[in-house]
Each structure stands twice: as C-alpha cells, then as structure tokens.
C-alpha cells in the first residue's frame, strides 16, 4: 500500500492525446485503489496533468497553507525520513523544497478558487507512486509509507507468527472471555490461556513483547449469542465482578492495557438501553484501569453494521481509543467492500476525533492484493492507526504489503 519508490507519469504527449480522443470522459483519480473525491476536476493543460493540490495533499496527510498576499502555497509533510516543507508560487515553474529550488514540469495556477499543480510533482516530492491509464483516463496514486500506530491481535493459532510481535506498537492477547454464566474465564473453547510450548510460555511471550518495546494488552472477548453479555451488563453484581476480574488478571499477568471485544449488542430489542448499559460498564472499568495505570481500548462493531448497541461518542470520552471492526460485511472469506469500510470511518468521525480511532482490518478477509487499499483509507482519513485481526492469518505476502504502508510509532 505504501510505496517508497516513485514512478514518473508516462509521456505527457500520451496524456494529451488521450484527452483529445476522449473528450466525453472525465479524469478520475484513485488513491490507494479507492476514488478520491474532488470539488474540482483534474485538467489536462498543454500536455500536463494538472490536479487540485489541496484535495490530494490533505488526503496524503500533508498540511496545506495558502498565502493570499504572496500567492504561495506551503505544504508541510511529516515523511518517514523527516519533515519536508514545499513552497509553490502561482505561475512560477520553480518551487522551494526545504529551501532548495526545484523545477516543475508546469507552473501552478489558480482557477475558480482552486490551485492546480502537475500530478508528477506528488511523485517526485511527496513519495506517492503515480500511474496513468490513457484508455480509462484514470490517474492512480499509491500513498507513501506513513508512521502511525500499529496494533495486532494474538489469539488462537497465532503462535506460528509470534515473530511479528516486535513489529507492532501494541499486541492484544485474546486469552480471556465472558462465559455463559456471566463470569470471566481463561479456559474458554475459543479464547483461552494457552499452554506452554516447550520452554516458551504465554507469560514469557508477554514479557518479551514488553522488553522489545511492544505494549501487551489483555484482550477479553464476549458474545451476546446466548444473551450472556446482556445478562452480565444488567446485573450489577456480575458487572462489578467482571470488571474486578479483568483488571486483576491484567495486572497479575504483567499487561499494560486492556482491550474489550464485546460483540453482539443492539441487533434487536431496546438498543438505547444496550448502549447505556455498555457505557456504564466501560465507564466503571475505565475508573479501575486508570487507577491501575492500564490503557483501555475498545473493539466495536462499525456504525454501518447490524449491531447498533455502541455509543461511539460517549465511549470515546472514557477509553483511550476505539477500534472500528470494519469487516464481516458479507460474511464471506473475501475482501471487504471498500465503500462500506470508508462509510464506517466517516460515520465514526462524526462522533469521535480521528486521533482516537483505529481501523480494524481482518487478515482473514484481506490478502496481499487488497490490504494496502484498506490501510490506505486509515491514512486518507488520518486515523490514529490500524489493528490487524490477527497473527496466524497474515502470511508473508500480506505482511510485506503492510510493511510498505505502515511504519510503527516505535520505529
């Protein structure tokens, strides 16, 4: 998804010819294989593909400042190799990049309130990979690597990819769950405390993660398939015991945080009550985690999914971050529809600051050809980061694509 190498546009003459042969077609821009919306269309001008600067730049996480007096545009990019400051002046073919003069293939210009620059400049100066399809008039950009929060989950059958743990900022270990009687256990059928593998113990894996700079979180799973989650939330005694047991387990086992994956609320019934009950649980849990110096993360169903029992706005005020589980839209082992993933992000952003949102990505759904596009949406919307479900499913090919896109904060 994130590609550090650059590709120059094909011969600009070819672009001009394509424009002449397909006047009825509008130029379309794809960023990380997903359409980028524009208030103004790209323009073919004297053989150069000119694009609205602000729209692409901000989608790449670049800050754009306009100086009306000097008629200059300043772009500030925090790139993987440091900060880059680019100053463009209207109607001038020379730009300044970190104070050094750089020639452009065409001078930037303003039209109907929009500043246009040569598309190739994004490749040369901002690390985006660019290509052009003459037949379809589609400009494709691949965003450069971005330093952002990276999380992964370690649960059943994850042992075979434990070598990836140090390559994430945080790993959530799914070793506990809510039972049907409303109590917490580490001996569930699907989420359980694993046995040692020779000399390698689960406690040792957690301790080694900490030593290597990865924050280990205890992940606690719950389902409402048999009403067990609702039962616990509505019973104050069960609720308080679950909170105490979760915090005690996390502290006893040397975790630095807790991530709740409480699923199934709000499919039917009193959705408002489901939200209030979960809010109450999380608020009480947050009081205990703060007192114990533990972080708190919540993995939540997306707002455009079937389960509506999650009050993103309120939950974000008490948790450290929210993970949007933007997957399982189709129920099939196939890539998630990007329109739905994008919609889930936009809905969440209406309720929660982007700095508190993490995009959950299922590596059961995605593969090495699609995962870059999903990560691209997290970058486009400038979310806190990504969370991968899960180790054991990623594979070398997908991991290589992840590494091309995301640079962990710990790096």
Regions found by a protein language model. Give the residues of each.
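Active-site clefts of carbohydrate-active enzymes
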Residues: 220-221, 228, 348-373
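Chitinase-like catalytic core of GlcNAc-active glycosidases
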Residues: 146-151, 179, 183-319, 324-341
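A generic structural signal for well-ordered alpha-helical segments
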Residues: 57, 123, 209-210, 289, ...
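Substrate-binding cleft of secreted/luminal carbohydrate-active enzymes
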Residues: 249, 361-411
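Mature extracellular/periplasmic domains of secretome proteins
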Residues: 160-165, 309-318, 345-350, 374-377
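Conserved, mostly hydrophobic/aromatic
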Residues: 171, 260, 322, 359, ...
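Primary recognition of N-terminal secretory signal peptides and signal-anchoring hydrophobic helices
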Residues: 1-167, 178, 218, 253
């Amino acid at each position: 998804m994130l590609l550090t190498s650059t590709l120059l546009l094909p011969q600009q003459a070819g672009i001009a010819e394509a424009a002449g042969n397909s006047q009825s077609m509008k130029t379309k821009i794809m960023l990380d294989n997903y359409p980028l919306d524009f208030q103004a269309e790209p323009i073919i001008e004297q053989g150069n593909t000119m694009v609205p600067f602000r729209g692409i730049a901000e989608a790449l996480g670049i800050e754009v400042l306009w100086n009306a007096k000097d008629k200059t545009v300043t772009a500030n990019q925090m790139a993987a190799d440091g900060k880059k400051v680019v100053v463009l002046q209207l109607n001038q073919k020379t730009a300044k990049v970190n104070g050094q003069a750089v020639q452009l293939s065409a001078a930037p210009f303003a039209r109907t309130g929009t500043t246009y620059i040569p598309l190739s400049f994004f490749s040369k100066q901002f690390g985006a990979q660019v290509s052009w399809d003459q037949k379809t008039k589609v400009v494709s950009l691949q965003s450069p690597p971005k330093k952002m929060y990276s999380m992964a989950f370690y649960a059943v059958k994850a042992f075979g990819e434990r070598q990836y743990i140090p390559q994430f900022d945080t790993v959530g270990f799914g070793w506990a769950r809510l039972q049907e009687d409303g109590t917490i256990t580490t001996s569930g059928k699907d989420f359980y405390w694993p046995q040692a593998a020779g000399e390698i113990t689960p406690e040792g894996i957690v301790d080694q993660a900490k030593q290597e700079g990865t924050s280990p979180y205890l992940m606690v799973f719950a389902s409402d398939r048999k009403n067990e989650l609702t039962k616990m939330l509505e019973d104050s005694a069960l609720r308080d015991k679950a909170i105490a047991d979760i915090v005690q387990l996390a502290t006893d086992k040397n975790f630095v945080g807790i991530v709740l994956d409480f699923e199934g609320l709000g499919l039917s019934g009193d959705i408002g009550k489901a939200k209030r009950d979960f809010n109450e649980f999380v608020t009480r849990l947050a009081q205990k985690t703060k007192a114990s110096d533990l972080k708190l993360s919540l993995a939540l169903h997306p707002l455009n999914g079937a389960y509506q029992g999650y009050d993103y706005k309120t939950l974000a005020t008490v948790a450290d971050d929210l993970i949007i589980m933007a997957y399982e839209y189709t129920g099939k082992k196939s890539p998630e529809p990007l329109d739905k993933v994008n919609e889930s992000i936009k809905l969440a952003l209406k309720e929660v600051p982007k700095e508190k949102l993490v995009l959950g990505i299922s590596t059961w759904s995605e593969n090495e050809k699609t995962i870059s596009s999903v990560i691209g949406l997290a970058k486009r919307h400038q979310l806190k980061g990504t969370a991968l479900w899960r180790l054991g499913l990623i594979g070398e090919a997908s991991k290589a694509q992840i590494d091309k896109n995301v640079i962990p904060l710990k790096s």
